[in-house]
């Protein structure tokens, strides 16, 4: 290009549209600045459907059976531009669905197939998702036909379910209800590597995988199929499998069922040298129209496809459910070889002709079946082998285990069963769905007021009631829709024993509420009483500040039992930090203020909502252990804006005592008048948060602060109430 003839930048207004043309950004200048972007992602401005769009309502209009039939027909309609292996797209769609759902991790509930994020970077370009762009394009005519009635998120997952059915495999149902996002998520930490497939970069010590990651390398869904760091060791591969599947919430039996069941279908693709493969979708040229991995080897498709670099089918009948995977796994000895692409894999020693697989394009041509290092782990690991041999001898048990594990895989990030849509939702409740009994009572406004009076007359303080309600509700994670106040699992193990919940105080509060419950003429759940107690305390605190308010309350929560609660499964919800209660379990490599932002994002809060809640919780004395850090008021228990007023007081100078503790000294006398944590001070330090804090510190916004605090409070209290459409705004009248 002749640079002398290149036009100047046409953006006179200074707007820029790509990193190359954006100049030096704030992030370039201050790479360690607090990232608040995750609190404003998925803004309505990016959603083409508009605020009024109701996916559940649209889905109710769907001809579900017709949709499934169209998917079945598509699977047998091989397209010249991307032909189906063995004449059936079923295995391809299973991989697409598995890789959509399989990014889920229990550590923070992020990932999974619940948002259709496989359409966007980085997932659409991960090496492990190679050529799945073609699977999504194959589905486009169906999405185009059914339009708003089926989300991409649901369709990507449903397609694999239909594929298993169509190939004779076992499924136990399907729940729809996944709503699409419209740009990549910014809150998910996929790792810190700058390149794909970099080996053990995310490990430390004795192969300890970084939390909350659930894949061994950047760009993989789970494990390296060639073995750890590409070394073909089945025993060491078993360690990686157990850890990564465990971080997705799967036990050994579920893991074996999924691997064996998934590899009953289809084949791996590594027909030639991977140098023939072009860039991933995000790096592909504009004329590729979002398709990546263009392949110049042979025809570039069919038997010439290059994806993972591994090559071959696992069974002799790769489009039919059977016990062939275990038959071959235990029926032969396996020798190490390499695929045409140079990847380590295993072939059977002297296989019978009946155990050879058909060629992807010509069923009359037979090719060797293969096993991957991770497949052989199911034979060489002692625990996996026991399960595998049991499944081999009991095909019906294997089929049932696979169907249940597959359903769990597809639905693990969807939260409670109340969110499921469609005619195929199983009647059975599964413990991983965190079931909560439904309630059959209603409360009149008068009864609610009577209950609030009883709670406020019980001797419990505003701080105790607010802290307990917050502890119950704030376990909610919008990532996988788990936690929350419904179920009152704060009464049960493990939550009742969590340090952050101050077990002695919690036991006292619950005892008082249970005593009130026992004296009532009608059934009211403890879950409702916990939330109502917090709401009553907020109303009392607002009244003390001069505002008569009604905190909206919607009864209808149930009380879960210990038998309905997976103790190990709930352990991952224990907060290691909760800035709203000024709690930090220990010092971490991530700052307390970053952990606050992460917590706020999981609660689905905006920056203003987070700010209002922090100010209110400090005023109400809701700190862990009753500490005075950040309690910038002489009227604890009164819902004032004192936190913001005193934080922004230029008469106070702040000095560090240690990493997470600061003293505020009077500039004139040098006297220590306040103490604070990093979470407190970030609302005066960060320019964005300070701007919001200034709004709430204004003399004319005392009422606005109360109103905004209540709105954010109710949002958290009702975060898991999927039966409620909208929270009513607090009715605020200044006294």
Curated annotation (Swiss-Prot):
There is a cross-link at residues 222-248 (Tryptophyl-tyrosyl-methioninium (Tyr-Met) (with W-98)). Residues 15-27 have a biased composition (Polar residues). Keywords: Heme, Hydrogen peroxide, Iron, Metal-binding, Oxidoreductase, Peroxidase. There is a cross-link at residues 98-222 (Tryptophyl-tyrosyl-methioninium (Trp-Tyr) (with M-248)). The record marks 95 as: Transition state stabilizer. GO terms for cellular component: cytosol. GO terms for molecular function: catalase activity; heme binding; metal ion binding. Binds 1 heme b (iron(II)-protoporphyrin IX) group per dimer. Formation of the three residue Trp-Tyr-Met cross-link is important for the catalase, but not the peroxidase activity of the enzyme. Its EC number is 1.11.1.21. Pfam families: peroxidase. Residues 1-27 are annotated as: Disordered. It catalyses: H2O2 + AH2 = A + 2 H2O; 2 H2O2 = O2 + 2 H2O. It is an enzyme of class 1 (oxidoreductase). The active site is at 99 (proton acceptor). Heme b binds at residue 263. One of its GO terms (biological process) is cellular response to hydrogen peroxide. Its cofactor is heme b. Bifunctional enzyme with both catalase and broad-spectrum peroxidase activity. Homodimer or homotetramer. Belongs to the peroxidase family. Peroxidase/catalase subfamily. This is Catalase-peroxidase. The gene is katG.
């Amino acid at each position: 290009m002749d640079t002398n003839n290149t036009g100047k930048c046409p953006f006179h207004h200074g707007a820029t549209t790509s990193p190359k043309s954006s100049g030096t950004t704030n992030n370039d200048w201050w790479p360690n600045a607090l990232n608040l972007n995750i609190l404003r992602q998925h803004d309505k401005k990016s959603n083409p459907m508009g605020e009024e769009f109701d996916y559940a309502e649209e889905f109710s209009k769907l001809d579900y059976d017709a949709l499934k039939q169209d998917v079945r027909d598509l699977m047998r309609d091989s397209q010249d531009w991307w032909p189906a292996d063995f004449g059936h797209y079923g295995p391809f769609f299973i991989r697409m669905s598995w890789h959509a759902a399989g990014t889920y991790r229990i550590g923070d509930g992020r990932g999974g197939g619940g948002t259709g994020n496989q359409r966007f970077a980085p997932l659409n370009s991960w090496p492990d998702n190679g050529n799945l762009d073609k699977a999504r394009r194959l589905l486009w005519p169906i999405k185009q036909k059914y339009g708003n009635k089926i989300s991409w998120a649901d369709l990507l997952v449903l397609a694999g379910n239909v594929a298993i059915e169509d190939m004779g495999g076992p499924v136990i149902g399907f729940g729809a209800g996944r709503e699409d996002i419209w740009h990549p998520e910014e809150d998910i930490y996929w790792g810190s590597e700058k390149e794909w497939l970099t080996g053990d970069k995310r490990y430390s010590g004795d192969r300890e995988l970084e939390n909350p990651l659930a894949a061994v390398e950047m760009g993989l869904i789970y494990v390296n199929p060639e073995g750890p760091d590409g070394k073909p060791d089945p025993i060491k591969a078993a360690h990686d499998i157990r850890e990564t599947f465990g971080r997705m919430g799967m036990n050994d039996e579920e893991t074996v069922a999924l691997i064996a069941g998934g590899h009953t279908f289809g084949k791996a693709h590594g027909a030639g040298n991977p140098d023939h493969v072009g860039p991933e979708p995000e790096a592909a040229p504009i004329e590729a129209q979002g398709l990546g991995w263009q392949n110049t080897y042979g025809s570039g498709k069919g038997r010439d496809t290059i994806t993972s670099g591994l090559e071959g089918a696992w069974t002799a009948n790769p489009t039919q459910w059977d016990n062939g995977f275990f038959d071959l796994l235990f029926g032969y000895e396996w020798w190490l070889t390499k695929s045409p692409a140079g990847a380590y894999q295993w072939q059977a020693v002297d296989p019978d002709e009946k155990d050879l697989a058909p060629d992807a394009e010509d069923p009359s041509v037979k090719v060797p079946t293969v096993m991957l290092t991770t497949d052989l782990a199911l034979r060489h690991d002692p625990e996996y082998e026991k399960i595998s041999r049991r499944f081999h001898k009991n095909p019906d048990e294997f089929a049932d285990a696979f169907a249940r594990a597959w359903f769990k895989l597809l639905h693990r990030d969807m939260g409670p069963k109340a969110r499921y849509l469609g005619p195929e939702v199983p009647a059975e409740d599964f413990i991983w769905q965190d079931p909560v009994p439904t309630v059959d009572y209603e409360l009149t406004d008068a009864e609610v007021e009577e209950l609030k009076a009883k709670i406020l007359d019980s001797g419990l303080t505003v701080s105790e009631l607010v802290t307990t309600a917050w502890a119950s509700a704030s376990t909610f994670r919008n990532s996988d829709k788990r936690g929350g106040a419904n179920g009152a699992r704060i009464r049960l193990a493990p939550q009742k024993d969590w340090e952050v919940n101050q077990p002695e105080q919690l036991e006292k509060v619950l005892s008082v509420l249970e005593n009130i419950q026992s004296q009532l003429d009608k059934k009211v759940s403890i879950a409702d009483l916990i939330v109502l107690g917090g709401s009553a305390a907020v109303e009392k605190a607002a009244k003390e500040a001069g505002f008569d308010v009604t905190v909206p309350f919607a009864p209808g929560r149930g009380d879960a039992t210990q038998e309905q609660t997976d103790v190990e499964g709930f352990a991952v919800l224990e907060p290691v930090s909760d800035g709203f209660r000024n709690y930090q379990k220990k010092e971490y490599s991530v700052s307390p203020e970053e952990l606050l932002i992460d917590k706020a994002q999981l609660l689905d809060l905006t920056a203003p909502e987070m700010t209002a809640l922090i100010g209110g919780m400090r005023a109400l004395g809701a700190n862990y252990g009753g500490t005075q850090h950040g309690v910038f008021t002489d009227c604890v228990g009164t819902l004032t804006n004192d936190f913001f007023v005193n934080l922004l007081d230029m008469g106070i100078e702040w000095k560090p005592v240690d990493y997470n503790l600061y003293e505020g000294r009077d500039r004139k006398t040098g006297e220590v008048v306040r103490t604070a944590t990093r979470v407190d001070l970030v609302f005066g330090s960060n320019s964005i948060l300070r701007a919001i804090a200034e709004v709430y510190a204004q003399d004319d916004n005392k009422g606005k602060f109360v109103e905004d605090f209540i709105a954010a409070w109710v949002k958290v209290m009702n975060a898991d109430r999927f039966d409620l459409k909208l929270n009513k705004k607090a009715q605020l009248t200044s006294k």
